[in-house]
Design a protein with these regions (language model features):
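Extended, highly charged alpha-helical segments
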Residues: 104-131
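N-terminal accessory targeting/assembly segments
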Residues: 1-109
C-alpha cells in the first residue's frame, strides 16, 4: 500500500536584530520536519526588521508564500518561528487548503505521531490545546 508522501514549504523569517543562528535554525526545522516523514520542497527566506502582528511576515509576502505553496502542491506551510494564535488564524483565513504549523506545532505533531498509548495521546492533545 503506497502512502502519499506529505510535503511542505518552510517559511524562515530572519529578524535583523536577532542573535539566533539563522542557518542552523533552518537546518534544524528541516530535520524536525523529516522526522514527521514530510519532505521539504522549498524554503522561503524573508528578512524583517520587526514582527508583523497580523502574519508575522508582511501581508504581501504571506500571499506570495501561499501562492508558492499552491504551485508546489504542498500539504503544509511551516514557519521556523512561533506564531501567535492571531497570526495563525489570519494566515488560515488566507488559505484553508494547506495546513499551517509553526516550530512548536511541528514538535507537538512529532510527539503526537509517536505516542503509543491512549494516555500519552491524550497528554499530547492537552498540550496542543494549551498551546
Amino acid at each position: 500500500m503506497n502512502r502519499k508522501i506529505e510535503t511542505a514549504i518552510v517559511v524562515a523569517p530572519r529578524i535583523w536584530k536577532s542573535s539566533k543562528n539563522y542557518h542552523n535554525s533552518v537546518e534544524e526545522i528541516s530535520l524536525l520536519i523529516s522526522t514527521l516523514g514530510v519532505k521539504v520542497k522549498g524554503v522561503v527566506e524573508q528578512k524583517i526588521n520587526t514582527i508583523n502582528p497580523t502574519y508575522f511576515i508582511g501581508s504581501g509576502k504571506a500571499k506570495q508564500v501561499i501562492e508558492q505553496a499552491k504551485m508546489l502542491g504542498v500539504d503544509y506551510i511551516i514557519f521556523d518561528e512561533d506564531l501567535s494564535p492571531v497570526q495563525t488564524k489570519n494566515f488560515q483565513k488566507l488559505n484553508k487548503d494547506i495546513k499551517l504549523l509553526d516550530r512548536p506545532g511541528v514538535i507537538l505533531e512529532i510527539f503526537f505521531r509517536n505516542a503509543k498509548s491512549k494516555e500519552s495521546k491524550t497528554q499530547v492533545e492537552l498540550a496542543r490545546l494549551q498551546y
